[in-house]
Amino acid sequence: MEDKKEEGESEIQEHGPEHWFSKWERQCLAEAEQEDQPEEEAEQSQQKLWHLFQNSATAVAQLYKDRVCQQQGLSLWVPFQNAATAVTNLYKESVDAHQRSFDLGIQIGYQRRNKDVLAWVKKRRRTIRREDLISFLCGKVPPPRNSRAPPRLTVVSPNRATPTETGSSVETDLQPFREAIALHGLSGAMASISVRSSTPGSPTHVSGSSNTGRRRNGLHDVDLNTFISEEMALHLDNGGTRKRTSAQCGDVITDSPTHKRNRMI
């Protein structure tokens, strides 16, 4: 039992976040963490600039001193040449130091960025989503994850004819709506028919006013179904769809109480 517990604990430790990386990956992470910042190069550049500035200041001061304490027959060309050379060297070294500092700043920025990304990777799961990485690099919040894809809506301009597939899909979507209205109209019609077929002495016999009201309700339901069917047939551009719609309307009108009432009369 103890051996099994130890094996289970070892498996849990092996599958932990710190054991997601391979040996080579851990070695790369260790080298990145131990990489020193290039501060020594920056200090050397500053010391060199300071040394050249001292030489330039000394040469300019010597030039001024020789001009004030000029002796008979002493030329000022040599002190001036020394001062000009020192100032020129200072300018050149300043330009080079500026470029080195710029490159050094980019290098330090990359190192810090790499360390931030590596620290972020250690805290994440074994598999990192692309949007999570992009949002981290861009400094933005990742978009919310939708478990289901949003429905795609097809927008058709009124000037363009609707394709056949679109018409059939619309008819399929509205089919339950049409069936519900048709069943409601048929139930009203059957109720009025059952009332008329009952004998005056039967318990189901009602007065003429209530019978007329039920007839009107049945007629109203059938008329509504007919109206909706005709409107749908007009808005669907598919010829086959119109034929199916008109056929359904004919079936409903055949069973309507109006038709049966005329037949009985």
UniProtKB/Swiss-Prot annotation:
Superkingdom field: Eukaryota
Region (Disordered): 1-22, 145-170, 195-218, 240-265
Pfam families named among the record's database cross-references: TAPR1-like
InterPro entries: HAPR1 (IPR040308), HAPSTR1-like (IPR029196)
Primary localisation category: nucleus
Regions that span the bilayer: none
Subcellular location: Nucleus; Cytoplasm
Similarity comment text for this entry: Belongs to the HAPSTR1 family.
Record note on quaternary structure: Oligomer.
Function summary: Acts as a central player within a network of stress response pathways promoting cellular adaptability. Functions as a negative regulator of TP53/P53 in the cellular response to telomere erosion and probably also DNA damage.
Protein name: HUWE1-associated protein modifying stress responses
The organism of origin for this protein: Xenopus tropicalis
Name of the gene encoding the protein in the UniProt record: hapstr1
